[in-house]
């Protein structure tokens, strides 16, 4: 496995020098590897793609990067909850997890979606609980910033649990759904539910801000982003994987067409 830790411009012609640690399964460094490349496509995941660029800018390795690098990090509106105390039989529970999604366009404050998962536990335990991923629209965005005291990038998300827009809307919908469909919503943090989650953290090198519409990172030719860092914090009440894949494919199609 390799862990990239440094990206610098190549001095004599366009391109980059990339340094990485080759590591074993205990995360011990085996050796340092250096690659001399014409193009870099960043796909380390939203946080780590952004972290590499934030640290490179702060350390002077890539000083021309946009000041918007690190901005616009969101949780995709994800809010995890569960229901128990169900009175109706909802079918077999040992073939799952079952999956379904629905949208409520009439919910106050804007539409909401919810994914239903039947818990894949043996009978009768599996009939005691269903887990649900609620997704809401939220304008709340954090930033990934360089911490000079530690020499690393870190996420700053200044929205408190329970009082954030995301948490309040998610909690409200969990109770709304339970009133309509039955059961008792579980939104306690003690049980691991009831707050925004980072299953789908998105942003940091946002489209048309820190990167252009084609995925090119502003400030440097030949540097591209092809993962969730390109997304603007949320993608509209869905799992973002297909949207990320589609924009990455679009970036590569346009790259091939112009190079």
For each predicted feature, which ranges?
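A conserved FAD-binding loop/helix module that cradles the flavin
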Residues: 233-255
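A short acidic-Thr-Gly-centered motif at the start of a beta-strand
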Residues: 24-34, 207-220
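Glycine-rich loop(s) and the adjacent beta-strand/alpha-helix scaffold that form part
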Residues: 3-11, 19-93, 227, 247, ...
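Flexible loop/turn segments at secondary-structure boundaries
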Residues: 6-8, 48-50, 140-144, 194-201, ...
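FAD cofactor-binding and catalytic pocket of flavoenzymes
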Residues: 66-178, 201, 209-211, 219, ...
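Flavin (FAD/FMN) cofactor-binding core of flavoprotein oxidoreductases
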Residues: 182-205
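Active-site-adjacent "gating/activation" loops or surface patches in catalytic cores
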Residues: 10-17, 213-214, 220-221
């Amino acid at each position: 496995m390799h862990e990239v830790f440094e990206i610098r411009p190549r001095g004599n012609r366009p391109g980059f020098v990339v340094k990485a640690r080759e590591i074993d399964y205990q995360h011990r460094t085996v050796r340092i590897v250096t690659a001399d490349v014409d193009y870099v496509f960043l796909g380390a995941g939203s946080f780590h793609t952004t972290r590499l660029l934030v640290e490179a800018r702060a350390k002077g390795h890539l000083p021309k990067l946009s000041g918007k690098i690190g901005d616009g990090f969101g949780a995709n509106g994800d809010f995890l909850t569960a229901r128990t105390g169900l009175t109706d039989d909802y079918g077999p529970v040992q073939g799952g997890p079952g999956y379904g999604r629905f949208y409520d366009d009439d919910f106050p404050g804007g539409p909401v979606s919810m994914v239903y998962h039947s818990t894949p536990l043996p009978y009768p335990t599996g009939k005691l609980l269903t887990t649900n991923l609620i997704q809401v629209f939220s304008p709340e965005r954090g930033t990934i910033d360089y911490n000079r005291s530690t020499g690393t990038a870190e996420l700053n998300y200044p929205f408190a649990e329970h009082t954030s827009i995301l948490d309040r809307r998610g909690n409200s919908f969990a109770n709304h759904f339970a009133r309509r469909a039955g059961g008792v919503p579980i939104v306690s943090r003690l049980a691991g539910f009831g707050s925004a989650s980072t299953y789908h953290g998105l942003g940091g090198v946002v489209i048309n801000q820190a990167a252009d519409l084609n995925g090119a990172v502003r400030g440097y030719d030949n540097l591209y982003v092809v993962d969730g860092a390109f997304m603007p914090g949320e993608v509209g009440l869905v799992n973002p994987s297909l949207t990320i894949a589609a924009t990455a494919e679009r970036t590569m199609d346009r790259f091939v067409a112009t190079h």
